[in-house]
Amino acid sequence: MSKDNRVKLPLDRLPELWPKSLKNVALGAVLHPASISASLTHASDVLKSHDGTLFRLKALFGPQHGYLGQTQDNMIEWGGFTHPLWNIPVYSLYGEHREPTPEMLEGLDALLVDMQDVGARYYTFIWTLYLCMRACE
């Protein structure tokens, strides 16, 4: 297969797909370990590479298991932290809070969600999406 025929995900095409109306917004992103590009780069790194050109990345949010899968055991809550390299908050949505609080959303203009799910009712990711949408109303 030639390089030109490779599958590209929307994450791989952000510069051409990012809406002009959202240019330079303060962005938060809800991500998990399967949030990756076609080259298997985690979405947080892809988003950071566009920080300051398409949007301003201000916060990350992680569901059950954490945004990078740091808590793989089932039903293990985790606490938020400050990203050690980017100095932005990484909020836990599977700890003290299950949905973003007004304080977490303060200063954000948009919340991007990139989480794959199998569609089974016992998976928590679909509920995390719902709770994020409700918090952003």
What is the predicted role of each segment?
Residues 6-56:
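N-terminal phosphate-binding or glycine-rich loops at protein starts, especially the Walker A/P-loop
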Residues 25, 108-109:
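Short, well-ordered alpha-helix to beta-strand connector turns
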Residues 35, 66, 116-119:
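Short glycine-rich anion-binding loops that position phosphate/pyrophosphate groups of nucleotides
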Residues 43-50, 128-136:
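Catalytic-core regions built around general acid/base machinery
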Residues 56-67:
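Short internal beta-strands
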Residues 73-108, 120:
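Glycine-rich oxoanion-binding loops at beta->alpha junctions
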Residues 117-129:
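Glycine/threonine-rich flexible loop motifs
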